[in-house]
Amino acid sequence: MGKAVIAIHGGAGAISRAQMSLQQELRYIEALSAIVETGQKMLEAGESALDVVTEAVRLLEECPLFNAGIGAVFTRDETHELDACVMDGNTLKAGAVAGVSHLRNPVLAARLVMEQSPHVMMIGEGAENFAFARGMERVSPEIFSTSLRYEQLLAARKEGATVLDHSGAPLDEKQKMGTVGAVALDLDGNLAAATSTGGMTNKLPGRVGDSPLVGAGCYANNASVAVSCTGTGEVFIRALAAYDIAALMDYGGLSLAEACERVVMEKLPALGGSGGLIAIDHEGNVALPFNTEGMYRAWGYAGDTPTTGIYREKGDTVATQ
């Protein structure tokens, strides 16, 4: 095994240079870089991949630029319903929450489910009460709200549409997938993954996508790979996208790059799915494939300068240490 490494994403979609100002680009790049740098420092200090991805996603949830935690989109009923998942590649233990509205950081609740319950997934009020009983603060759902997200809900209603994230500059938001995630390989050779989302603008209350589902939007196994997905959740569920990467590597003998190409560029589009994913294999190779115009992403080996990206760049989808 080589050096420890982390990768994060903040959603994929029809991201156009023409629609985004330099100032807007810099806001995203600075946020992504800072979060990856935090993860790199944690890895250098010998912290576990599980702790690193949990903290990275918590920071993404705290950033209103992304559709997770603060800045989450609205449901049709003008509420917020958040989902998250974490998975430890060393033990294959996982935890997830779905449809929570009063927990500031759903990824921390998912971690509690994994470590302090016999379950893998908990939903709604039961998940919230479980987290409250273990020290998490109850917050008003209003903390997740932003004026931009509300404007996007109104626009979606006007169009009679359910959209994957928000509408309006700087993106063609009807095609933007609002999810955040992190994957990491630590100095002990352990992999971990975490994913969190606010879901779809104008979604029906109770809808759950791929993000909190082990094997669909989040997966980690030390024998192969850690994966976090972003895209059309219903299709990622049907395709078991995250696990399919691992299966193609384990049973098909494909490399990380080959498995990602097969899933993201062939299998998902065949089902009408768009989006992308981030993945790190057990050897420390990194892949960041997407079949949309862009994906907010960043990655870096411990001790190196982070690499960030928004748009499609030639040769940037796979990195080998």
From Swiss-Prot:
Keywords linked to the UniProt accession: Autocatalytic cleavage, Hydrolase, Protease
Keyword Repeat among record annotations: no
Enzyme class: hydrolase
Active site (UniProt): 179 (nucleophile)
Family classification: Belongs to the Ntn-hydrolase family.
GO molecular function: asparaginase activity; beta-aspartyl-peptidase activity; hydrolase activity
Gene that specifies this protein: iaaA
EC identifiers of the protein: 3.4.19.5
Pfam families to which the protein is assigned, alphabetical: Asparaginase_2
Entry binding sites for substrate: 207-210, 230-233
GO terms (BP aspect): protein autoprocessing
Protein name: Isoaspartyl peptidase
Subunit structure: Heterotetramer of two alpha and two beta chains arranged as a dimer of alpha/beta heterodimers.
UniProt induction comment: Repressed by cysteine, an effect that is attributed to CysB.
